[in-house]
Amino acid sequence: KYLSGLRSGVGYNELKRQVSETLLKIPVVGAGLVEKISRTKDSIKQLVIPGMLFENMGVTYLGPVDGHDIKTMVKTFKEARRMDHAVLVHVLTKKGKGYAPAEKNPSRFHGIDPFDIATGKSLKEKVYPTYTDVFSKKICQLAETNPRLVAVTAAMPDGTGLKAFSKCYPDRFFDVGIAEQHAVTSAAGMAAAGLKPVVAVYSSFLQRGFDQVLHDVCIQNLSVVFALDRAGLVGSDGETHQGIFDLSYLSCIPNMSIMAPKNLWELRKELE
């Protein structure tokens, strides 16, 4: 915090400018001195500043800053605004900060229904199993009899129903983070190596991996299963999660078989 404040302060930057201008006025050796001082300063920064990757690209790095400390945040942004070049402010936050149930289970509160504030539990009673519930149970059952079956997701193990699989078969579960393209290409590599990958992803998010589905999986005619959650109209997740384009953009791809179960029984059979 101290270093970030010092480096972004008016006094420090003005002093740095004046020193450089003064040294440059020295005949013959002035420019060389400025360069050597700059290199020495950069070497020291490499040791003490975590954001040197950005500094090396000419972007001033400020942080890390506690994103829940409003006073520090305001001060840091004011300091950044005073600079006349690119600045990156690194802010650290904790999802659900200040509400114990959300801090304990942040993914549960990523998208929520009405819930009891005291307990954090949903007020919506679950009467029937969902497609996600059935997929979650079935994929674990299939993995029992097929040791080659592996599961891939892009930072959505809960939403896609792979949470149970990740606990039952941690060595066969791969979460690649928010990178659908990488999830698809990784699955292609697994299939080429003889595994049976199942990529569980939201329908609208698979759009980001369209080129990989086409080029890395289907043109290679590799055996990869794409289990698309939130296919069709899904009102509760908002307009960005409506999976209304998958049939269109997947049906034009060669070596692709598309199945759309109309009920839970069909879903189980199609997975088999």
Which residue stretches match the model-derived regions?
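Alpha-helical membrane-targeting segments
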Residues: 7-52
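Thiamine diphosphate
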Residues: 45-51, 56-76, 82-271
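Acidic, Ser/Thr-rich peripheral helices and adjacent loops at domain boundaries
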Residues: 2-21, 108-114, 247-248
